[in-house]
From Swiss-Prot:
Enzyme Commission number(s) from the entry: 4.1.2.40
Single annotated GO MF: tagatose-bisphosphate aldolase activity
InterPro entries per the UniProt record, alphabetical: Aldolase_TIM (IPR013785), DeoC/FbaB/LacD_aldolase (IPR002915), LacD_aldolase (IPR050552), Tag_1.6-dipho_adolase (IPR005927)
Protein name: Tagatose 1,6-diphosphate aldolase 2
Keywords: Lactose metabolism, Lyase
Species: Streptococcus pyogenes serotype M3 (strain ATCC BAA-595 / MGAS315)
GO biological process terms, semicolon-separated: 6-sulfoquinovose(1-) catabolic process; D-tagatose 6-phosphate catabolic process; lactose catabolic process via tagatose-6-phosphate
Annotated family: Belongs to the aldolase LacD family.
Lineage of the species this protein comes from: Bacteria, Bacillati, Bacillota, Bacilli, Lactobacillales
Pathway: Carbohydrate metabolism; D-tagatose 6-phosphate degradation; D-glyceraldehyde 3-phosphate and glycerone phosphate from D-tagatose 6-phosphate: step 2/2
Any matching Pfam family: DeoC
Length: 327
């Protein structure tokens, strides 16, 4: 099935990609970034620190990315120093979730809308939802209605809607556990099926790889839960779960594991259309910035950060499929 895009959405999608492949840098982290910074200093990270680090990453790495994902809370200064060639996505959700309940309901930023995100110069709206396909029906209906609203907003503003799905299990506390690894493919692929329906108005899915590669033979250091063939089948099932373009998030794994995973995904038959890669690219700059200052962080980004993004781009050249084949 080929999906039809409006002229404006097509132009925006082209601005966000290079030759149909989305090689985007993700730096919309807020809560996670504050926690990373807090590991290296005793005082609470300041707004100025967060804005400065985001701006450094944007300035130094967007010349090598097709686009950058930022948040409107701390990322607007960074959006203004990005490469002229790089597109911009802005996150629409509040960071984090209420840990006292298993529902993880979504919430929009209070003073933002799809209209305002477009006015801020973004080519796309990105929204994150936590979803448990096997969770309570009442909660999941609330989440579906929420995404329908955002889809309608994005249609009205004629701006692409990138939906990020992070899966979880209401009964399993640790997503890194073997217990969750056993159900991850089901969680990821079934959630993709749900939100690929036309009623949600999603243009691109930003998703997890369907297997925790740390439990796959040939990738695992310890316990092996999956053969390579079982893992490959999960990627094939993922490809079959949607007609929409989909891109992978790096989920905080190392640059090397993420790159190896992309190669495995492509060899398995996943026709993914790029990545929104965050911590796997820039995480090392946080410690340097806090301990040695902005100039040292800039130097790290020009060397290690560049190496990470350059290696990733080379892998994408060999593995990713253009979204233009689907739209």
């Amino acid at each position: 099935m080929t999906i039809t895009l409006t002229e404006n959405k097509r132009k925006s999608m082209e601005k966000l990609s290079v030759d149909g492949v989305i090689s985007a840098l993700a730096f919309d982290q807020r809560g996670a970034l504050k926690r990373m910074m807090a590991q290296h200093q005793t005082k609470e990270p300041t707004v100025e620190q967060i804005e400065e680090l985001k701006s450094l990453v944007s300035e130094e790495l967007t010349p090598f990315a097709s686009s950058i994902l930022l948040d409107p809370e701390y990322g607007l200064p960074a959006s203004r120093v990005r490469s002229e060639e790089a597109g911009l996505l802005l996150a629409y959700e509040k960071t984090g979730y209420d840990a006292t309940t298993t529902s993880r309901l979504p919430d929009c930023l209070d003073v933002w809308s799809a209209k305002r995100i477009k006015e801020a110069g973004a080519e796309a709206v990105k929204f994150l939802i936590y979803y448990d396909i096997d969770g309570g029906q009442d909660v999941n209906e609330q989440k579906k209605a929420y995404i329908e609203r955002i889809g309608s907003e994005c249609r009205a503003e004629d701006i692409p809607f990138y939906l990020e799905i992070l899966t979880y299990d209401e009964k399993i506390a640790d997503n890194a556990s073997p217990e969750f690894a056993k159900v991850k493919a089901h969680k990821v692929n079934e959630a993709m099926k749900v939100f690929s329906k036309e009623r949600f108005g999603v243009d691109v899915l930003k998703v997890e790889v369907p297997v925790n590669m740390k439990f796959v033979e040939g990738f695992a250091d310890g316990e092996i839960l999956f053969t390579k063939e079982e893992a490959a089948q999960a990627f094939r099932d993922q490809e079959a779960s949607t007609d929409l373009p989909y891109i992978y998030l790096s989920a905080g794994v190392s640059a090397k594991l993420f790159q190896d995973t992309l190669v495995f995904a492509a060899e398995s038959g996943a026709k993914f259309n790029g990545v929104l890669c965050g911590r796997a690219t820039w995480a090392g700059s946080v410690k340097v910035y806090i301990e040695e200052g902005p100039q040292a962080a800039r130097e790290w980004l020009r060397t290690e950060g560049f190496k990470n993004i350059d290696e990733l781009n080379k892998v994408l050249d060999k593995t990713a499929s253009p979204w233009t084949e689907k739209m």
